[in-house]
Amino acid sequence: MGWIPALVILGLSSVAAAADDPIVEKLEHGEVNWTTKTVVATGSGAPNLKLENVAAVRLNAERAAKVDAYRNVLEALKGVKITAGEPGSKALENAQVRAQVQGILRGCKTVDTRYYSDGGVDVVVRCALDGGLATTLSPVKSYKKVKMDGEAKYTGLIIDAVGTTAKPALKPRVLDDKGEPVYEAAMVGPSVLRQRGTASYARTVDEAKQNQLVGKSPLVVKASALGEVASDIQISGEDAAALRNVNQTFLAEARVVIVTDGP
């Protein structure tokens, strides 16, 4: 089996391991499930009673509801944190980025359709944050080489940030005690970044350990503080050194889970 299909399978199994109590951030026009890395929004379509028959009225209302749902996803994305100091709204000010995102949203999955006796329709759509959306909203301009020689001591990284009020984001960073990056999106391979993003999120360390993403031998570290923005997590100098001095293949593959109290 090639490595790209393997990534797809791993991504699916990671989602399957999500907790019953997902990390959900409520936004004005929708919500983000940071456990499954998806954004969900609902659209409504009113009936056009001037149409010739019931089927035409329903179809027209369903189409209108879907367009409204896409519009609400776009609005919801404005509130999604790329980093805690960089909301999606900033990226979407760019007309080209906004047009690209609108095109990607056409591929969102309809997860529920509700029909009403008056002919109105509600449509619920769900879109994956990782992949095209994340890389379009915040492309990595340059990549950093990571240490890939030596013994592969760890299969993943779990950062216990419970109690630090760390905020989920598309591009969180892990910093040392001096504020220098130990892990960031620029260290992740481009194809991996598109496949599953920079990091996943969990509510407990036990839940994180059950995520197949981090493998059987993850390094577990405790966050000591937050950086200048709440999606940047600081770890001790000792833990940072441990990360820098080992084979970092697991970082290049974004095998990272951040444990947090939630948004």
Could you describe each region identified by the protein language model?
Residues 1-4:
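Bacterial N-terminal signal peptides that target proteins for export
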Residues 9-10:
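Compositionally biased, low-complexity segments
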Residues 13-14:
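N-terminal signal peptide c-region/cleavage motif recognized by signal peptidases
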Residues 18-263:
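Domain-level marker for long, solvent-exposed, non-transmembrane regions
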